[in-house]
Amino acid sequence: MHLRHLFSPRLRGSLLLGSLLVASSFSTLAAEDMLRKAVGKGAYEMAWSQQENALWLATSQSRKLDKGGVVYRLDPVTLEITQAIHNDLKPFGATINAATQTLWFGNTINSAVTAIDAKTGDVKGRLVLDARKRTEEVRPLQPRELVADAATNTIYISGVGKESAIWVVDGETIKLKTTIENTGKMSTGLALDS
């Protein structure tokens, strides 16, 4: 039996065209069903709390007009704002420790991290991660990505800069446990395999 006709250019072209049409119809349906809603200026990262059935959004607001930022609690189905937590520092990166229901936000501009109780919205504490003063020669590392290890209540925070680092923070005491230095130039990504 010859299968040569199954590999003809005409059949390959038809299969490719058919695949593209099917794929584009799915993406059109997905785009039509996607819920979008304007929430605030400077939306940066989100954290999802299954226990609280909430989506938390870090917004830095306006760079020049607003001194701080706002963390919004959103209904994950409707994207309605159910709570707004005003912060004197601009929040950028976001994560949540599901075990303690503590939200963690990286304050990139201030080289700090803020811990917020997800149930009450109260600030539990703040830690400055790089206290060096910014000058022409010195560029303090900036917190970028945050990952929470719920099993150990440890927060890992990438510090972006010329000589990047990862800060390891005790989630209970909100104190620096250790720093993993020299993780590369401008290293931004962070993942936890526990």
Explain the meaning of each model-derived region.
Residues 9-19:
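Sec-dependent N-terminal signal peptides
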Residues 2-6, 10, 23-194:
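Predominantly soluble domains enriched in secretory-pathway, periplasmic, or organellar proteins
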